[in-house]
Amino acid sequence: MGSVKRKSVEESSDSAPPQKVQREDDSTQIINEELVGCVHDVSFPENYVPLAPSVHNKPPAKDFPFTLDSFQSEAIKCLDNGESVMVSAHTSAGKTVVASYAIAMSLKENQRVIYTSPIKALSNQKYRDFKEEFSDVGLMTGDVTIDPNASCLVMTTEILRSMQYKGSEIMREVAWIIFDEVHYMRDSERGVVWEESIVMAPKNSRFVFLSATVPNAKEFADWVAKVHQQPCHIVYTDYRPTPLQHYVFPAGGNGLYLVVDEKSKFHEDSFQKSLNALVPTNESDKKRDNGKFQKGLVIGKLGEESDIFKLVKMIIQRQYDPVILFSFSKKECEALAMQMSKMVLNSDDEKDAVETIFASAIDMLSDDDKKLPQVSNILPILKRGIGVHHSGLLPILKEVIEILFQEGLIKCLFATETFSIGLNMPAKTVVFTNVRKFDGDKFRWLSSGEYIQMSGRAGRRGIDKRGICILMVDEKMEPAVAKSMLKGSADSLNSAFHLSYNMLLNQLRCEEGDPENLLRNSFFQFQADRAIPDLEKQIKSLEEERDSLVIEEEESLKNYYNLILQYKSLKKDIREIVFTPKYCLPFLLPNRAVCLDCTNDDEEPQSFSIEDQDTWGVIMKFNKVKSLSEDDDSRRPEDANYTVDVLTRCMVSKDGVGKKKVKAVPIKERGEPVVVTVPLSQIKSLSSAIMNIPKDLVPLEARENALKKVSELLSRHPDGIPLDPEVDMKIKSSSYKKTVRRLEALENLFEKHKIAKSPLITEKLKVLQMKEELIAKIKSLKKTVRSSTALAFKDELKARKRVLRRLGYITSDNVVELKGKVACEISSAEELTLTELMFSGIFKDAKVEELVSLLSCFVWRERLPDAAKPREELDLLFIQLQDTARRVAEVQLDCKVEIDVESFVQSFRPDIMEAVYAWAKGSKFYEVMEIARVFEGSLIRAIRRMEEVLQQLIVAAKSIGETQLEAKLEEAVSKIKRDIVFAASLYL
């Protein structure tokens, strides 16, 4: 892949040469008061001979009323040369200028241009902006179609892909395709749509890719150049038009601490001062939310101001507004906004302006919808200059809040991180109410990429000299963690490609479609191929390291090592049987002495003894646990139901992020007597001894005395007088007896093994283990190389084709059948289950309202713990859906597609069936909300998505001549498409 790199600094300039600043990541940033530089690179396909740059005498397609930045003028030169370009720059840097020029150029040349964005809200905004500027502009989002024959079409990426598969006439005419927010390609669910669209784009079209800063922009451009056999330029800038200052606001404190200045220098002394200013909150004063301490909102005692109130007050006093305060939950967003109830930020004139704009916006709503609690409750806080923005809001309210924010009538906006995507709404200040977030699996620190994306909203170009970012910190944080978050690099643009049945069927149905070709040309395959030389280098290095480890009597030692592993595995099996709740619960009595395993595999080196390290303690009680802890990865599903509180000897320390860490240690070692909660799997044995210890164990002396009694027991009986599983606990399990016999046989082998008494055996075993680990790494890397050199997803592709043949979607010759034609049209829901239901006759037999209710299970993904069971007729339909889903999943499993059958079946949720049924029956939205008990915006999004699915089913029914079903589905659309749920966007 050819590459030419040049700095975009005009040599003819009379200005002083730009100053280079070496940053911590070794990259060079060019800074100059008059001219700020960028890196311009270009990727060529193999064997491509670049043409000499043409000299343009023709006037520019568009003039701008301001001086262009270097990166903008460099990108525009590429467009004038008729070549594709990727522009990678920070939020609010001015990437839209390049898109605007591409549109102007296309319209001037009478060419077709398509602008795509990841979200409908952004498409609506861009449509309004481009319509005002160019007039010949249309919009296609799935919800709305306006002037589809316009020369410039604004659409979502999903609509573009759909047009490509259908062989739309527009695709044959398009000269330029603009992909905005192309870094969305790494999204695990929707990112694949970008890859498909780019691969399938017409070969004679050119591209404009607009992206946030990504470190591997060159790799992406290399891929585009290879797939489309055309040059692709990269114009990359790290420059922020408005530099940022980063502050810490410690919980309970009163001041701001500058930790990173506008020159990106990290002030460690200031950071430490901010942590020292943290006011520790008493356990009783901490506000809890589902057992977790809420972040970012330390509530003062009665009469005191909360931290959030103090901070916003300070921001307003220092004229740092407008401010966006990011939170990671919809409920917390609203709770924080409510803490501002006494704060008034707008003048009387501004309040009147808010009321006028708000009244005008909701004028299209019915009188009933105007009385919705969310509508009536939000106006008072908006008038005070405070707003809330999250996905649970009614879409019309989200838009009116965006408009008020743009007009400067909202000074303080509480928003979730979705506000940082695409929408051009910068503020002077951005506040992070929390620096930790729950990612669906565990609580973790924000990544540098997430921080960069959200902090990019700070600083308004041409208005603010600098933008301000404030982190609210309420727990100790290591400087290294803070530095990596505040000064780390952006997230790489990595492929999230995955196969789907809809993709596969559309590829087989297309005249020029070829699933293998799509896989071969995917960014995923490109990245896999790229990694091979580096992997081979790693393998060679590891093989050299492996060969350098020479061990005496290696085979005999390996045999002994394997015996140790077998022994430990059998001991573990025995413990799992003995400590299943049905056997052990009757014996988990308070004050019983208990032996615990205190070997920690994550921290301790591998033990080569057949005995693990253990400690002793006293049982306090056992607990029934409802579900796995959100942030405890060590707890295993099989013992998730019970934990045991044990008083034992512990080492108490702080971990890398300042959190208290408690680890059980052998009872004779130094440490504190602490009550810890352990899973059943950590218990090694139960003693028959019940200790006589005081009830009040709060005093340290009482706890020390309790452990002293355990030590006295062990001095008399070193094994602690364990309960015998068979005699005392009455375990009659045949698998237990069988495992015990195998363990005894192994113990005999240990005694007889010739190497057991060999000198330095532990050191030899350590070397052997190192060698075994190297062998395992080499094997894993070789497997990766083999799978990389083969076509990615090749086995999965074969398996999915088997599924489609088994279910009757394609013939043995890969010709798409009737069922397959239906599934081709369904891209907004699980296509196989929906098609199977359609062909089973359920859609024909069900009433229209029941059909709509059933479809809600395909679009609702949130799990509502207190959702009521739907009425009998709806529940019967849901059971049929589950049966169909199970059958589809089991066929996939039989055909070797990796799938968890139960998880797949459980992914269809009945939680809003009743609410949607009521909506289809004609109920008012406020009545439906009383049934649903979810955020209004979440329900509206689900119903709109459902309408999308219905439209796809209408096209599917039409394609197979099912006119009766088509009419029924159209009736379903007419029943749900009304009132506030489908209120028109304010941007249109």
From Swiss-Prot:
It is found in: Nucleus, Nucleolus. Ubiquitous but preferentially expressed in active tissues. ATP binds at residues 89-96. Residues 307-509 form the Helicase C-terminal domain. SMART domains: DEXDc, DSHCT, HELICc. One of its GO terms (molecular function) is ATP binding. It comes from the Eukaryota. This is DExH-box ATP-dependent RNA helicase DExH9.
